[in-house]
Amino acid sequence: MGRTNFVKMRFIKIQATVLAAFFALSQFSTHAAPLVPGPNDGRIAYVTARLMEEYHYSQQPLDEEMSKKFFDGYLETLDPRHENFLQADLAEFSHWRTNLDTLTIGARGTADLTPAFQIYERFVERLQQHDAYVAELLKRDKFKFTGDDKILIDRRHSPYPKNLEAAKKLWDERLRYEYLQEKLSKEISPTNDAILPLPKNADAKIVDTLTHHYNWNFHMVTNWDSTDVLQAYLEALTHAYDPHSDYFNTEHAQDFSIDMSLSLFGIGAQLGEDDGYCTINSLIRGGPADKSNQLHEKDRIVAVAQGSKAAVSVVDMELGKVVQLIRGPKGTQVRLTISPMEDRALRKIVTLTRDEIKLEDSEAKARLIELPDGKGGTNRIGYIDLPSFYATIDLPGSSNHSVKSTTADVTKLINKLKQEKVAGIIIDLRTNPGGSLEEAVRFTGLFIKDGPVVLARNPDGEISKDNDPDPSVLYAGPLVIMINRFSASAAEIAAAALQDYGRALVVGDTSTFGKGTVQDLNPLRPFWPALSAATNDPGTVKITIRKFYRVSGASTQLKGVVPNIILPDVLNYSPDIGEASLENPLPWDTIPSASYDKLNLVQPYVTQLRERSDARVATNQDFIYIRQDIAEFKKLQADETATLNEHEALTERQTNEARQKARDKERSARKAPDEKIYAITVENAGESSLPAPEALTTTNYIATTNGIAFNVDSDFSKYFETNAASKNLKAKIRTEVKTLPPDPMLNETENILEDYISLMKKSDTLIANH
């Protein structure tokens, strides 16, 4: 498996920001007059900096050293692949590198934003040069891929090009690589592994594809306004303190609230971009768009109007800005000018009343699983997929959402599983990024008596405890928690507490993400008394204010939670996942342990459970495939280049395709799983009967997210009206998961839980007999 290996590329893609590919062609090679800061932008930057100095956990002043991190971070935000800025640009801007502190907080009350806007304008200038050069290459070059050239895929740690000639060499390599990838995708037969002859117009189609791609991406960058520049600049400032502090303008703050609340006020549509048009990808069931019966998938939105006001054209508008126009307070009207899929020349106006949209795909869900017991009967176990620790959060000026609570939803699901007499429960926290700390504490309290769940230390060194105040226990049976390298923050708190108490067995990757910090939201308006109520919202600053610790006293920062049983996974070998891979993380440390009543429900069985699991994993065919992928991934990690030789690349891709098809063939020949799965949702958990069992095939076990987070491109432009990338990623994962292979992690965890139940029963029998 070579440089075209998908596993490699999916890791590269997830790291790169959308800006990494924002180059252009001549269609958008002109740039409007230079941007200037908005009237309040300097004040916003000043207040943000002062809040970071005052409230951040590190208590670090914005000094010369922080200025260096601030400056470097801004360049990284704009040009993460180090292929547009020249070393001459860096030399020209170098006097700012140690002076951003003075420019930001030196003047009383207002920051000097000259560096932010001049650096951005230089970036656009370099993109225009990139534009002209790529356009020239596509017009005149007949690309040949017969030599031994290679391209360094990940340039994050490489120096910026020395001069324009060096930059052109990088641009040429990148374009040739992208051209080759397009060509390869057209050369392999979709039905077998044969190499197909290219059609006569193939080169022209590839040029058209790349032209459109570059045009659109460049347009998105040069379409920035002053708020976009300020957003990027203040992100660099806050990230200089740690990777989780942030500045949110109004749009980003709303997205954060929606992520936490799992609801928004809008029309209920999933939107995407297609050739410069905002396109309806799907309708959310029960939303205003769905109920209107006037909107359909693939319809284009060409203009948006608020109530009776004039319509605003949204053709070629950045998708996030279209989203902002469509969202609005509950009960208000929005008029959409639609170009229907069946007749693009037609224009029709659809008036919708905004309503609250529930994002049910992101809430907790359960499955009742019936497994054969080997004696002619069945064992019943429960499975709960918890994508995040969500909770209602209202920002100043926002309308009240209906109350949403992770703990309340999980309680309903567990009560239903208990009603169905499950012998044990699996809770899946894989790819759970965290969320509400309060919800994580309350969730943990469902499984333990009262006591501390998490410790926290503030900047003054004061240690506090977040306790479960409720002595009742909702579920006292066998419990297994699944984690992976993407389980973070509040998910780590819950997993760590249940592990420290000896209440749950933790299974999964080598460790969780390692985010052991707590953030607080600080709207800027209260710090700005003179700001008129009619003035646009100045934004919100998210600040890391505490570090949290396990009840054992160890931090989860950097090191994460190590499971009781580790399963093989390619994710275990990526250095680019986890807190340690981010810029400016806070260090790991310990504090004194809390006093808590430790249970002994796990440790007596861990050795036997691990031995049995290891024996199964050693011979399980899916884990054999995973170990093969791990070996290939290690080879890829050792060589970060990709070949530009067509024959070599095509052979590699053909080999990879053949390997995957052989695996698919082997899997399809397997006997269908001898189990029944019943889907339980928050909505149907209160019903007395179970729904019909799900149809199962050899390639469709339970839909979960483990190991497939990289099966989507980080540059995809599908948005719910939330425009929230993490949720879109999960939504796309969940819609595609049914075509993926079985989830061996979950299947093995089911086996582990069955062993755990059996061992606990034997132990109870021995105690009873004694």
Where are these regions (language model features)?
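Extended, small/polar residue-biased N-terminal targeting/export presequences
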Residues: 62-68, 72-150, 218-273, 333-335, ...
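PDZ/PDZ-like domain segments forming the peptide/carboxylate-binding groove
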Residues: 76-77, 98, 109-112, 116-132, ...
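Bacterial N-terminal signal peptides
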Residues: 15-27
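N-terminal secretory signal peptides that target proteins for export/translocation
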Residues: 1-12
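Extracytoplasmic/secreted envelope proteins and their assembly/folding machinery
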Residues: 41-49, 63-75, 82, 90, ...
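Conserved functional hotspot residues or short segments at active or partner-binding sites
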Residues: 153, 177, 181-192, 200-212, ...
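Polar, glycine-rich mid-to-C-terminal structural blocks
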Residues: 490, 502, 507-577
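Cleft-lining beta-strand/loop regions that shape enzyme active-site pockets
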Residues: 32-37, 50-63, 214, 219-226, ...
